[in-house]
Every structure is written in structure tokens, then in C-alpha cells.
A protein has these predicted regions:
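Conserved GNAT-fold acetyl-CoA-binding loop/helix
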Residues: 20-45
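Conserved beta-strand in the GNAT
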Residues: 62, 68-77
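A short, internal acetyl-CoA/4′-phosphopantetheine-binding micro-motif in the GNAT/acyltransferase core
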Residues: 91-102
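Conserved acyl-CoA
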Residues: 107-123
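Conserved beta-strand-loop-alpha-helix junction that forms the acyl-donor binding cleft
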Residues: 112, 124-136
Length: 169
């Protein structure tokens, strides 16, 4: 069975590689490299976050050795607009294409549930992709109770990866 471990700063380049691969495969919006760097640095080195910093907290779980990651999952603590109740939400579950037949995705979703159990927070997860969507949804339906669906509309001629996120401030 694969072992999911918490990524560290030593995994930065490999995490970045997998995040960029995931964006290339699943992008719905343009990439903001500075935001990605900020988040990776923050999640890979949580001890550097000041205690009074109210910003985003999370963890990145990985499968594979240092310098050769095979799969990655990102979780962060969040809340919904109508409550202060916290929950975990995933922002990435991705398996390198070379390792897609290994069961890593199932291992990562199990790890996500374990993290929710450890900290005692509900876990909210979504599949946001146009690539192999149905297969991913089947895995998530087998793993998590369904509580809704997610839809995305691009007005007019705007399409996924458009400049929408750069122009709507």
C-alpha cells in the first residue's frame, strides 16, 4: 500500500511540477505563479507562519520519494459564507499520468478522510475538471457522500483559461 506523507520544503520543486501538470490538465482559470508560490511555501513550511497570521492554513500530502513524487493532494481549512464553522476542503488531488493505474487517487482520498478525522473537521471535496471527469466523479461518489453538484458558466466568448480572472477585479 502506498504511504501518503506530509510534503516539506524539500519537496517544493516536485510539488510545483505536479501543481503545474494539474493546472495544465484541469485549468479553469489562468495561472498566478506568485499566488502558487505563496501557497506552496506556506503549506510546505507551516512553522514559519506567525501565530497571529489569520491567513490560509493547510497541508500537502504526497506519495513518492523526495525528488520523485507520484501523486499529490492539497487540503486547507476554510469556512462558508454563512458560518464561522471550519471545515477542510481539497484544492488538488492529482496523480502523475505515469502512475494513474497504481491506486494512488484512492489512497489520497482515504488520506483526506483521515486528516478530517484527526483534526475533527468535516471534509468538503469537489471534482473540478474537464479531463476524465466521470472517472474522477465515480471515485469520489464511492468515497464521499454526495451533497450537491458544481457548475461553471463562462459568459459570451469567455472560455476556460481565459483572461477572466485577470480582468475581473
Amino acid at each position: 500500500m502506498e504511504i501518503v506523507r506530509a510534503a516539506t520544503m524539500r519537496d517544493y520543486q516536485e510539488c510545483l511540477r505536479l501543481f503545474l501538470q494539474a493546472h495544465n490538465e484541469n485549468d479553469q482559470f489562468s495561472l498566478a505563479p506568485d499566488k502558487l508560490h505563496w501557497m506552496l511555501t506556506r503549506f510546505l513550511n507551516p512553522d514559519a507562519i506567525p501565530e497571529d497570521d489569520p491567513g490560509l492554513r493547510g497541508i500537502i500530502g504526497v506519495i513518492g520519494r523526495e525528488g520523485g513524487l507520484e501523486a499529490i493532494c492539497g487540503l486547507c481549512i476554510s469556512d462558508l459564507w454563512y458560518t464561522y464553522d471550519k471545515h477542510l476542503t481539497d484544492f488538488l488531488v492529482f496523480v502523475d499520468p505515469e502512475y494513474r493505474t497504481t491506486g494512488h487517487a484512492k489512497t489520497l482520498t482515504g488520506w483526506m478522510k483521515t486528516q478530517a478525522d484527526i483534526i475533527g473537521m468535516p471534509l468538503m471535496s469537489a471534482v473540478v475538471t474537464n479531463h476524465r471527469t466521470e472517472a474522477k466523479c465515480r471515485l469520489f461518489r464511492r468515497t464521499f457522500p454526495k451533497v450537491g453538484e458544481l457548475f461553471l458558466y463562462y459568459p459570451g466568448s469567455l472560455t476556460a483559461g481565459s483572461s477572466l480572472s485577470r480582468t475581473a477585479h
